Amino acid sequence: MTDSILKCTTRHIRIFTARCENNDLVQDSEHLTLDLDPDNEFIWEELVIGKVHKRFSELVDSYSGKDLSDYNLRKIGSDLEGTIRQLLQAGELKYNPDCRVLNYSMGLPRTKDLL
């Protein structure tokens, strides 16, 4: 294992091989930290956050016993991006109209008018 923090950064997901202590990341190869939607592009309800965390746990468990590599972290991050997209398309997640930049990165909102 490496002495530096491995990370995966996607548009809405950041995963680090670190733990958070006093708002700082401390390298820990036995721990993964998930930073969900750091730009606050979406409005998150606890139930939806729970679904993303559950999927994250499932993905991490599926890599149990395998090398923790940049590639595997990117695969987990990409899968979580897909989960976010599914939640958005199902109407369980909504864009945050107060977001700094509202760019509809996961596609236009689905409304009855647009369907």
UniProtKB/Swiss-Prot annotation:
GO molecular function: oxidoreductase activity, acting on NAD(P)H, quinone or similar compound as acceptor; quinone binding
Membrane topology, as annotated: Peripheral membrane protein
Keywords: Membrane, NAD, NADP, Plastoquinone, Quinone, Thylakoid, Translocase, Transport
EC number: 7.1.1.-
Keyword Membrane on entry: yes
Pfam families assigned to the protein according to its UniProt record, in alphabetical order: NdhM
Primary residence: membrane
GO cellular component: plasma membrane-derived thylakoid membrane
Domain of life: Bacteria
Family label: Belongs to the complex I NdhM subunit family.
Summary of the function given for this chain in its UniProt record: NDH-1 shuttles electrons from an unknown electron donor, via FMN and iron-sulfur (Fe-S) centers, to quinones in the respiratory and/or the photosynthetic chain. The immediate electron acceptor for the enzyme in this species is believed to be plastoquinone. Couples the redox reaction to proton translocation, and thus conserves the redox energy in a proton gradient. Cyanobacterial NDH-1 also plays a role in inorganic carbon-concentration.
Subunit structure, interactors included: NDH-1 can be composed of about 15 different subunits; different subcomplexes with different compositions have been identified which probably have different functions.
Protein name in UniProt: NAD(P)H-quinone oxidoreductase subunit M
Lineage, broadest ranks: Bacteria, Bacillati, Cyanobacteriota, Cyanophyceae, Synechococcales
